[in-house]
């Protein structure tokens, strides 16, 4: 998508920086799961107040067989938001870490992720996230520093595999977003309209905004009939733990090509500068039953792209 890795960097004057305090946090993630592995990332220092950064780290994990992932559990310092795993065939030296670029992200395929607060994200039933043989695992670690201090970001990710020999169906991902988001100082709103380009079987949907969010609504229009999934006054804890709506995998939400998804977001930007995508967001995420093993897709301001 055009700018899923967009960041809003609100730089403060260097004179002001001289009065800021550097804060260090303890970071002790639990050990790797018995049937899985752990990826620990190099810390990122000097994260400035009022900034959002997205880093990509190419790990030393290059798959020698296809992996079937059942769950991921992310761990980050308090400004982490979130930690996400991708894979790529365009390999870099292990440990390469830099702010993610559009060119980088265009070479990645989404594998899964976690909010980064130690909450395990598990796919239900016999669903798994598939990672092919012969690819390099890449971790995207996002840091949102809404404090008045210079901070260090640290991240780790535990990956739990499905039990071998069990029946498996691939889980997929959807996103509805506008990465050209720009929020002026004060109150603002945005509407996103997406028309489905293919049939999907959805088992989970959830909204996503950051701390300046006020309200979000998500509607689906199925066969011409509108159904409201969310109508929420936003709360601070929703940033990391949003409400979600789920359907049994035996009876998923059936979305047909031509159906629509409507997302409405409202904010109150109490800072003194406009915000762009990264510092704030307006997103609806969906998880699908992807037995056909098709590419994940996202609707970015009405334009469908693979990710």
Regions found by a protein language model. Name each.
Residues 2-8:
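Sec-dependent signal peptide recognition
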Residues 19-201, 207-307:
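Beta-strand-centric surfaces of beta-sandwich/beta-rich domains
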Residues 14-16:
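C-terminal motif of bacterial Sec signal peptides marking the signal peptidase cleavage site
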